[in-house]
């Protein structure tokens, strides 16, 4: 073997690497713009680009010294660095959540480890005043060996940490050869079991830093914030001591403090009347470290974070983290994430009211945190540790106690892993210690708890007592051991029910409560943002939460014939061990198009809310949910009053003043119309330009219904009370059919089902297939557990049968009285139904359904009718909640209004197709082809869905690009639908959102019409 077996040695994580240090980019002169443009530094030489590459199925196949200078690599392929070799067509993609993709046999990994050999030639020219050269790798998965000009330079692991090598003595003037051997797995892979696609290669930047012999090696900036000043302490470490001038400037370039380092490298400076950094006003100062031959410019923010009386305070104010978990993921580049891609994510997060990010579950590229400093995000920086795999080991006794005991003992509580775990925490802290945006250190994710994490926490708290710590897996412990939690500041939980949170706050509450993951955003969902918001703001000990997660993880494989991107998830690449589409759990699609769940989050976390409004005297109370900004400085508030969806009055509220976390009283007197559904909408727009946000950007809205004499929707009333036409209806029947015929229509009712199988109106065919009573929906990802009960109850195979059909006819029309049931093979009757149809001479159909569910059965997915309308009926007008999909527990981003759309545009195109596109709290809907159509209306609010796809088609296929359109416009009119929730990885749907009624009545009318 060409290389030593460091990759299976827990005592060797690194060989010949430099000690970990803070991140910075030096230059020969002062440069202020290196955060997003570090390539502009004359001391920074980027080695990215086209490299020679050879993939090997096994490390044992690497038999030749490819790293030797002059080795013939003409037979090698060419790849782009940074990159991951799976995206370049080598090896295969694999998505797995918890299970290791290899046997659990630490520290050993499979003998035939796939690996990649990289070779790159580059020019290097030594500078007289910067004669030292340091080779930096910011991200390599999983471990790697390095050679420069054929000479061994070192070894390192920990994929998301920077590895730095002193290669001064290995470089030649002029052309040089850099060679790297990257292994897919190493002993560290047992700590790299993050929920993501597993990818390999050099996935972050590679560069040289040219540096003087005598210069700063490392520095640590800490601050002591007082009422009117801040003491800035710089603790510097030198390669060799050198006098360093230190200047601190405010954002406008004015010098606020300056000094020179003492011999011991320690300097304290005082800044008077400091502006403190926070996510709403990310005010940064510049620190300029000037040495004879080098200048380092860094940016610092002054801020405090502390816990008092079990409450988290930031700059002395109670804080709520409005956070999201973010992975590095792109469908085209994999783990490779550019500054532009990061900026796009941060912009979208700002636009949707996030103020915090958890770097799940590893440190991001170092400039990510500098960008969070600048754009205003509080960050949980998380160590590159997840050892979730031992949780899945085979156990005879599968109790919680044994499960946690076995999970803990394998890695977290095995001293053999102490060095590796502490190393990963130290690499993170040392690199990122000077970033003001980082307010919390996380020891990792889902790795159980034990002595090794106690050591990591103890080191972290000793090194940096000013930040808080969290580690959710501390609760997964061996019950036979008493652990030390003194260095853990928060009680962190993933996906607890609201009742669990209530119980903790009532019975324990010893630490602030953090929802480190909540509201699992998989597919159509989440349906519980508002309820968690209310819980978070109910108790000061709740410091907020981080939604799981930011983006769907998928791999793009070109474009299908229908123009849709072929996104692949777990199992689509032929891998045996995988977790399906569980990686498709983001608030944005892989290309960053927002899900409706992101829109829901945005409006739930709007900066202002209506507390109350006295319609009589016009007195309104608003609450400011901002942590630092007064409303008068942050938002302009506009109002609109609508009548049945049309604006009748609008304007702007004046003099809205409210300090953070307090109320404002304003006056808004409105002339409310006597008739129609009247809604008042407040729209909150950004008053000032902010990082990543333009002035005038809409931050959210409030909507409230106003009282009046007749609050019925006037168009719905017209449909319900339209003048009857005098005429006659001919009734014919046989054993199977009941035929109703009048001047303008012919309706055929199937006597076996009690439902219409054909509808002709004004010479046009309205339906292509028989009407159905519908209790099924294409299961959402959040239905993954309840759907097992639904399928056990055979809801997915239910159909309608009739027992009795009675027909009465009088001068008002035809009355059809029916006794029906919803049944399915092998199970008892699901629903017993009494139904009445009334058909008027003008073709209007009035329906009354009274249904009783067998108590043995689980909650229904939905109940309503399904019609397969003529496909040319593709235009929708409705009054209800829109414009995006809305459900009983997922409608905070929607408002009541009059909306128009094409049917095809109402489809929410989830990558794994599922129930979508419903609209909640509707009064009426009209579906037309431009000339004729059908109206569905009810005295009571209903939900509807109009789609080009059947629910069977949505359930049949695994990917959206496989969908085949129906020959009909599929129209579902629902009395009710079960809530959406977030049960894909969270609690059950809350009781108040369940469709658990055992008896209910549904009244509606169907009215065919011809325009004009």
Give the ranges of each region predicted by the language model.
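Beta-strand/loop-rich accessory regions of lumenal/periplasmic or secreted enzymes
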Residues: 87-89, 184, 278, 669-676, ...
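An acidic-aromatic loop/edge-strand motif
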Residues: 84-87, 92, 99-108, 157-159, ...
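Extended acidic/polar, glycine-enriched regions
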Residues: 172-175, 235-307, 678-715
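Intrinsically disordered, low-complexity Pro/Gly/Ser/Thr-rich segments with frequent PxxP/GP/PP motifs
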Residues: 260-272, 645-675
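Accessory beta-strand-rich segments of carbohydrate-active enzymes
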Residues: 2-18, 37-38, 52-56, 84-88, ...
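Surface beta-strand/loop "capping" patches
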Residues: 213-240, 595-635, 721-735, 849
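Extended substrate-binding grooves/exosites of carbohydrate-active enzymes
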Residues: 1-39, 96-98, 151, 190, ...
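Core domains of carbohydrate- and sulfate-ester-processing enzymes
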Residues: 48-115, 180-212, 310, 387-398, ...
């Amino acid at each position: 073997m060409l290389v030593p077996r460091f990759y299976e040695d827990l005592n060797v994580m690194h060989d010949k690497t430099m000690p970990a240090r803070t991140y910075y980019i030096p230059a020969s002169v002062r440069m202020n713009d290196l955060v997003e443009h570090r390539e502009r530094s004359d001391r920074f030489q980027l080695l990215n680009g086209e490299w020679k590459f050879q993939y090997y199925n096994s490390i044992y196949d690497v038999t030749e010294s490819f790293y030797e200078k002059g080795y013939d690599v003409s037979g090698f392929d060419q790849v782009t660095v940074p990159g991951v070799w799976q995206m370049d067509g080598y090896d295969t993609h694999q998505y797995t959540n918890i299970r290791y993709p290899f046997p659990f046999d630490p520290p050993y990994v499979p003998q035939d480890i796939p690996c990649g050999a990289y070779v790159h030639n580059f020019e290097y020219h030594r500078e007289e005043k910067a004669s030292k050269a340091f080779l930096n790798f910011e991200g390599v998965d999983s471990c790697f060996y390095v050679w420069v000009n054929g000479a061994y330079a070192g070894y390192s692991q920990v994929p998301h940490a920077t590895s730095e090598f002193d290669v001064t003595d290995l470089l030649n003037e002029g052309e040089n050869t850099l060679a790297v051997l990257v292994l897919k797995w190493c002993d560290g892979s047992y700590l790299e079991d993050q929920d993501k696609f597993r990818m390999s290669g050099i996935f972050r930047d590679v560069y040289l830093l040219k540096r003087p012999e005598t210069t700063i090696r490392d520095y640590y900036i800490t601050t002591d914030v007082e009422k009117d000043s801040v003491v800035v302490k710089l603790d510097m470490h030198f390669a060799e001591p050198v006098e360093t001038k230190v200047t601190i400037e405010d954002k406008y370039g004015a010098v606020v403090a300056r000094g020179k380092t003492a011999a011991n490298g320690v300097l304290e400076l005082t800044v008077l009347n400091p502006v403190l950094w926070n996510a709403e006003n990310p005010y940064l100062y510049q620190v300029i470290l000037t040495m004879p031959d080098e200048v380092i410019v860094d940016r610092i923010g002054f801020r405090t974070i502390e816990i008092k009386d079990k409450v988290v305070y930031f700059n002395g104010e109670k804080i709520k983290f409005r956070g999201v978990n973010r992975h590095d993921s792109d469908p085209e580049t994999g783990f490779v994430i550019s500054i532009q891609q990061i900026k796009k994510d941060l912009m979208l997060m700002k636009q949707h009211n996030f103020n915090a990010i958890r770097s799940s579950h590893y440190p991001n590229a170092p400039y990510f945190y500098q960008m969070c400093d600048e754009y205003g995000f509080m960050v949980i920086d998380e160590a590159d540790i997840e050892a979730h795999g031992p949780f899945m080991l085979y156990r005879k006794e599968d109790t919680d106690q044994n499960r946690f005991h076995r999970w803990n003992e394998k890695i977290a509580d095995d001293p053999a892993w102490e060095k590796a775990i502490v190393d990963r925490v130290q690499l993170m802290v040392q690199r990122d210690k000077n970033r003001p945006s980082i307010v919390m250190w996380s020891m990792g994710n889902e790795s159980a708890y034990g002595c090794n994490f106690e050591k990591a926490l103890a080191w972290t708290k000793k090194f940096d007592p000013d930040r808080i710590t969290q580690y959710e897996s501390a609760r997964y412990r061996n019950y036979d051991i008493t652990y030390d939690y003194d260095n853990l500041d928060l009680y962190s939980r993933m996906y607890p029910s609201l009742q669990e949170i209530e119980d903790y706050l009532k019975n324990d509450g010893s630490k602030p409560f953090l929802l480190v993951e909540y509201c699992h955003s998989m597919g159509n969902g989440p349906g519980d943002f508002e309820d968690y918001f209310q819980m978070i703001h109910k108790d000061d000990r709740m410091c907020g939460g981080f939604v799981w997660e930011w983006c769907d993880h998928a791999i793009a494989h070109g474009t299908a014939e229908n123009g849709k991107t072929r996104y692949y998830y777990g199992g689509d690449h032929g891998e045996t061990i995988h977790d399906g589409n569980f990686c498709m759990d983001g608030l944005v699609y892989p290309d960053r198009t927002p899900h409706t769940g992101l829109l829901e989050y945005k409006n739930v976390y709007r900066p202002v809310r209506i507390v109350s409004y006295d319609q009589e005297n016009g007195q309104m109370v608003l609450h400011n949910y901002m942590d630092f900004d007064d409303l008068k400085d942050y938002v302009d508030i506009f109002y609109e009053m609508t009548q049945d969806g049309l604006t009748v009055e609008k304007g702007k509220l004046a003099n809205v003043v409210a300090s953070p976390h307090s109320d404002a009283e304003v006056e808004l007197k409105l002339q409310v119309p006597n008739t129609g559904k009247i809604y008042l909408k407040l729209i909150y727009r950004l008053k000032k330009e902010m990082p990543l946000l333009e002035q005038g950007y809409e931050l959210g809205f409030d909507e409230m219904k106003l009282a009046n004499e007749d609050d019925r929707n006037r168009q719905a009333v017209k449909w319900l009370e339209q003048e009857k036409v005098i005429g006659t209806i001919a009734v014919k029947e046989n054993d199977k059919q009941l035929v109703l015929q009048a001047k303008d229509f012919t309706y055929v009712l199937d006597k076996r089902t009690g439902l219409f199988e054909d509808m002709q109106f004004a010479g046009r065919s309205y339906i292509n297939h028989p009407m159905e009573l519908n209790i099924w929906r294409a299961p959402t990802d959040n239905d993954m557990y309840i759907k097992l009960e639904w399928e056990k109850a055979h809801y997915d195979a239910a159909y309608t049968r009739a027992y009795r059909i009675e027909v009465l006819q009088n001068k008002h029309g035809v009355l059809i009285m029916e006794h029906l049931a919803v049944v399915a093979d092998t199970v008892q009757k699901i629903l017993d139904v009494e139904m009445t149809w009334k058909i008027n001479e003008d073709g209007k159909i009035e329906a009354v359904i009274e249904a009783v569910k067998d108590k043995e059965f689980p909650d229904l997915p939905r109940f309503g009718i399904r019609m397969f309308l003529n496909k040319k009926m593709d235009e929708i007008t409705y009054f209800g909640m829109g414009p995006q999909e809305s459900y009983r527990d997922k409608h905070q981003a929607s408002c009541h209004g009059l909306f128009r759309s094409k049917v095809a545009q109402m489809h929410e195109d989830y990558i794994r197709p599922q129930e979508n596109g419903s609209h909640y709290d509707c009064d009426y809907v009209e579906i037309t082809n431009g000339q004729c159509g059908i109206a569905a209306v009810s005295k009571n609010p209903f939900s509807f869905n109009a789609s080009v796809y059947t629910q069977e088609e949505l359930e049949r296929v695994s990917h959206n690009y496989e969908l085949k359109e129906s020959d009909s416009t599929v129209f579902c009119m629902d009395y009710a639908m079960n809530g959406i929730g977030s049960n894909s990885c969270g609690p059950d749907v809350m009781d108040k959102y369940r469709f658990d009624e055992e008896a209910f009545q549904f009244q509606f009318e169907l009215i065919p019409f011809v325009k004009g």
